[in-house]
Amino acid sequence: MKKNLLITSVLAMATVSGSVLAAVTNGQLTFNWQGVVPSAPVTQSSWAFVNGLDIPFTPGTEQLNITLDSNKDITARSVKPYDFFIVPVSGNVTPGAPVTRDTSANINSVNAFLSSVPVSNGFVGNKQLTLSTAVEAAKGEVAITLNGQALKVGSASPTVVTVASNKKESHISIDMNAKAAAADVAEGAAINFVAPVTFAVDI
């Protein structure tokens, strides 16, 4: 009995002693949340943007994957593209409800272009990245692509969007990537990009 008590006492003292000598250090993490207030689906009288279930499509906020190279320059790339369709419709278009496709109408052509230069947010000094004319952005640039083609600003330089052979739909995939120098990005900063795209649809 005495032997057991002695061992217990020694262990207890060792525990207390260890607690007294331990140094407390702090580590901080920064968490970011971002969202966009949903807007009404964009529709015309004869066509609409829809998802794969024919539900009216409104773009939300996609995530960026950001990596650092050995010089601490960054590459930002969308985790997944925006994926949707343009289809001829008849009747009313209701948010959250499948559209009625107009099977008697054909899509003759679809052109797309950037309404303005993409806005870059979160960079040092409010730096704005230059729009890339290539699919892959160089340092200091942002590239917005549609079905693998780089989008340009203005209706004078549209991207021709492929239409299905039966002319009943046009599939669209919009992606982005950007590169920036280490000096233009603060550690822990939250960055994002906004790009308005206009579609000219001939039904």
UniProtKB/Swiss-Prot annotation:
Keywords on record: Fimbrium, Plasmid, Signal
One GO CC annotation: pilus
Localization terms from the record: Fimbrium
Signal sequence region: 1-22
UniProt main location, coarse: other
Entry function: Major subunit of fimbriae. Fimbriae (also called pili), are polar filaments radiating from the surface of the bacterium to a length of 0.5-1.5 micrometers and numbering 100-300 per cell. They enable bacteria to colonize the epithelium of specific host organs.
Protein name stated in the entry: CS5 fimbrial subunit
Taxonomic source organism: Escherichia coli
